């Protein structure tokens, strides 16, 4: 008697993970290993990447970009091979999962590419969580965070979300109990900046000025207090990003963007991380929406967001 073949049941787990802005970023000197120690306050904001992980009968990992992406996919260079962070995240999960199958990853891109907001890191965090669920790996959040750190400094934060202090190269995270909302307008650029190049430029500027940077040991407690209280006015006076001048050196138009934002009602502005995304702080949600609309009329790509928001989370789990 023939045993009926077992039909493969495909399943899709969809996860969303937030982009981030650096509310503060202190950068130490270049270390012998080429990296820089940092002290940063990360804020997860309401601009999300989505990854749909679908099990496949065919072994291996494939990646595609969703037509629902809000980015112009023709204008950005996103690898779909093993160099993609989401691909690498799936490969790491396959190595530690007893029931791994083939998987197809469809990524919905909304966070600017090479924009200083950790879009690729959000893809990786979403993929870790999606594959953990898809393959019933049963890893704890702590175990997932350990794998996330192997992929890049920003990946653990996208998994965690909320507000956090990052030390080391940004991967040593301590959650900050700052849940009050702040409102921002993100002005995105039609170009990217290479994070290593921005750090090299900062080193060059410091060397030319004879500046010996100190190793950062912590963040300004006033920033955390302002975030805990949702005090935009206090926060506006203490935003800091050591990389900002290097980003402006490479892309002088960022100085104009900051100026235009503040002239149209932003109470402060900062380049996020290595840029080129500019984060403009607004008094409240109404002011943020009005500012975004004004900047759009100026021909800029601007959208209102808020933070903090939760980290990567499953939004659907479907048998096909």
Swiss-Prot record:
InterPro entries: GHMP_kinase_C_dom (IPR013750), GHMP_kinase_C_sf (IPR036554), GHMP_kinase_N_dom (IPR006204), IspE (IPR004424), Ribosomal_Su5_D2-typ_SF (IPR020568), Ribsml_uS5_D2-typ_fold_subgr (IPR014721)
Chain residues that bind ATP: 112-122
Record carries keyword Cell membrane: no
Annotated EC: 2.7.1.148
TM segment ranges: none
Recorded family membership: Belongs to the GHMP kinase family. IspE subfamily.
Function comment: Catalyzes the phosphorylation of the position 2 hydroxy group of 4-diphosphocytidyl-2C-methyl-D-erythritol.
Stated name of the protein: 4-diphosphocytidyl-2-C-methyl-D-erythritol kinase
Name of the gene: ispE
């Amino acid at each position: 008697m023939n045993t009926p073949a077992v039909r493969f049941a495909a399943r899709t787990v969809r996860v969303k993970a937030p982009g981030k802005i650096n509310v503060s970023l202190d950068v130490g000197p270049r270390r012998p290993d080429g990296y820089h120690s940092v002290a940063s306050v990360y804020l997860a904001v309401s601009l999300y990447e989505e990854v749909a992980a679908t099990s496949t009968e065919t072994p291996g990992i494939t990646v595609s970009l969703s037509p629902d992406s809000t980015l112009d996919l023709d204008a950005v260079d996103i690898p779909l091979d093993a160099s993609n962070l989401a691909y690498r995240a799936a490969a790491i999960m396959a190595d530690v999962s007893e029931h791994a199958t083939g998987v197809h990853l469809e990524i919905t891109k909304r966070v600017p590419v090479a924009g200083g907001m950790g879009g690729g890191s959000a893809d990786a965090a979403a993929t870790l969580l999606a594959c953990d669920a898809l393959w019933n790996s049963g890893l704890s959040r702590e175990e997932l965070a350990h794998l996330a750190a192997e992929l890049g400094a920003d990946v653990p934060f996208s998994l965690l979300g909320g507000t956090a202090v990052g030390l080391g190269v940004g991967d040593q995270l301590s959650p900050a109990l700052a849940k009050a909302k702040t409102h921002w307008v993100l002005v995105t650029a039609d170009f990217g900046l290479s994070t290593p190049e921005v750090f090299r430029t900062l080193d060059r500027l410091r060397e030319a000025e004879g500046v010996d940077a100190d190793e950062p040991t912590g963040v300004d407690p006033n920033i955390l207090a302002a975030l805990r209280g949702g005090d935009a006015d206090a926060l506006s006076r203490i935003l800091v990003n050591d990389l900002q001048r290097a980003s402006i050196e490479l892309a002088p138009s960022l100085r104009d963007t900051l100026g235009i934002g503040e002239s149209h009602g932003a109470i402060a502005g900062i380049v996020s991380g290595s840029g080129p995304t500019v984060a403009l702080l607004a008094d409240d949600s109404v002011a943020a929406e009005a500012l975004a609309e004004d900047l759009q009329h100026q021909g800029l790509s601007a959208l209102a967001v808020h933070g903090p928001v939760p980290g990567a989370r499953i939004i659907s789990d479907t048998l096909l």
